[in-house]
Amino acid sequence: MTIAVGRAPQRGWFDVLDDWLKRDRFVFIGWSGLLLLPTAYMAIGGWLTGTTFVTSWYTHGIASSYLEGCNFLTAAVSTPADAMGHSLLLLWGPEAQGDFVRWCQLGGLWAFVALHGAFALIGFMLRQFEIARLVGIRPYNAIAFSGPIAVFVSVFLMYPLGQSSWFFAPSFGVAAIFRFLLFLQGFHNWTLNPFHMMGVAGILGGALLCAIHGATVENTLFEDGEQANTFKAFEPTQEEETYSMVTANRFWSQIFGIAFSNKRWLHFFMLFVPVMGLWTSSIGIIGLALNLRAYDFVSQEIRAAEDPEFETFYTKNILLNEGLRAWMAPADQPHENFVFPEEVLPRGNAL
């Protein structure tokens, strides 16, 4: 009798590393974690550092940190100075030359947070792809998360790249984002942009679908428990349905005359509406980066200029936008030393 003794297959460093990264642990790392974890850590750390200690006096002429008296709503990591253009503002670059304090004064933390934040979001999407592949499910979670990534990249990176500098991107703060929204309206008439309209329809439509779906499921739960709390009657591993699709279909058929009869189509629609809203609004922001206009009703503006008694909601909004530009620009861009004489400031037809 012959006994054959096999040799154990050789395992290279890549196989060992792959096994370690994909090991079942409390916090899954994976290959995507090599991108996600360090970039997210640095982006969050940079934001906390900036909002706590770093002033915006040298970039925007304002206070923006807790150290200067701001609160959670008014603190921000502000965009770099307009003179920095589209520099990456590396700490060791020609602007800061390795001086950390100087780097913070110039707005280097904003570039640091924006770039690391973008890579962290991409890493999180790759994490969903990786785990979906390991679990054996389809990657629609990752596809859905491409919506927030598109918005972040278009607003914080693509828009300022189309403008003269990073200065015109939104700063990382609550009130700073609100200021950016007013800026978009005043300088781009953003609310009348069709891509903004599609974005609003997608986001609010997604919220409506979410509310309707949740309420309908709660309405049609099977009475399969004896306790008053229906949540305790559900088991994650149960084979039977927990609510009645047939009853839900009958209910909405009576309400609207039509209803979803296919759960798969229903849930795809709930995925499609908000994600398309995010994608379309991102496309619109890229249009704004290129200073593209949308829905300029010039005929109404000409008639309003000729006839003091003619005014529409559109012409009123145009006047409001002119006011935003005239009053906002001197405060928003103090380095330009804008001075608008009283006679050129916008006035409504009633004046």
Curated annotation (Swiss-Prot):
EC number, as in UniProt: 1.10.3.9
Compartment(s) of residence: Cellular thylakoid membrane
Matches recorded under Gene3D superfamilies: Photosystem II protein D1-like
Membrane topology, as annotated: Multi-pass membrane protein
Record keywords, A-Z: Chlorophyll, Chromophore, Electron transport, Iron, Magnesium, Membrane, Metal-binding, Oxidoreductase, Photosynthesis, Photosystem II, Thylakoid, Transmembrane, Transmembrane helix, Transport
Binding residue positions for a plastoquinone: H213, F260
GO BP field: photosynthetic electron transport in photosystem II
Database matches in InterPro entries: D1/D2, Photo_II_D1/D2_sf, Photo_RC_L/M, Photo_RC_L/M_CS, PSII_PsbD/D2
Disulfide bonds: none
The keyword Isomerase belongs to this UniProt entry's keyword annotation: no
Binding-site positions, Fe cation: H213, H267
Reactions catalysed according to its record: 2 a plastoquinone + 4 hnu + 2 H2O = 2 a plastoquinol + O2
Positions with a binding annotation for chlorophyll a ChlzD2: H116
Subunit (UniProt): PSII is composed of 1 copy each of membrane proteins PsbA, PsbB, PsbC, PsbD, PsbE, PsbF, PsbH, PsbI, PsbJ, PsbK, PsbL, PsbM, PsbT, PsbX, PsbY, PsbZ, Psb30/Ycf12, peripheral proteins PsbO, CyanoQ (PsbQ), PsbU, PsbV and a large number of cofactors. It forms dimeric complexes.
HAMAP family: PSII_PsbD_D2
Comment field (misc): 2 of the reaction center chlorophylls (ChlD1 and ChlD2) are entirely coordinated by water.
Family from the record: Belongs to the reaction center PufL/M/PsbA/D family.
NCBIfam families tied to this protein: psbD
Protein's name according to its UniProt entry: Photosystem II D2 protein
